């Protein structure tokens, strides 16, 4: 069993914490539903223009686990023009 974690640092086109909350909740819900990952906002909760999101996946295959998180990043870039991906760190736990 292989556990991989990813930390996404995002820049958001949001002018308020309420707007940020809507964007973050949408991203987390889609990730959970479409990629079967655990997901949470892990840092910068009080900063309206940025977010740090954490995702974790478990798989029997190291390659499959990493690929899941990489596809999540690709989908985020494709579907969310209001979000800029500043950095992504994927590692095996």
What are these regions (language model features)?
Residues 36-43, 83-89:
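Short beta-strand elements
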Residues 1-5, 48-50:
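A general secondary-structure signal for short beta-strands and their flanking turns/coil
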Residues 57-93:
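C-terminal structural segments of small proteins and small subunits
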Residues 4-10, 54:
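Active-site-flanking beta-strand signature of metal-NTP-handling nucleotidyl enzymes
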Residues 41-61, 92:
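Short, charge-patterned binding micro-sites
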Residues 20:
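C-terminal binding/interaction regions
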Residues 10-14, 33, 59:
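Beta-strand elements of well-folded, non-transmembrane domains
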């Amino acid at each position: 069993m292989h556990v991989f974690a990813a930390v996404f640092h995002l820049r958001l086109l949001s002018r308020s914490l309420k707007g940020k909350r809507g964007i973050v909740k949408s991203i987390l819900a889609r990730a959970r539903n479409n990629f079967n990952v655990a997901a949470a906002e892990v840092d910068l909760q009080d900063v309206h223009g940025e977010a740090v999101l954490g995702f974790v996946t478990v798989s029997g295959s190291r390659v499959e686990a990493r690929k899941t998180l990489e596809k999540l990043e690709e989908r985020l870039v494709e579907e969310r023009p209001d979000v800029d991906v500043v950095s992504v760190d994927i590692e095996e736990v």
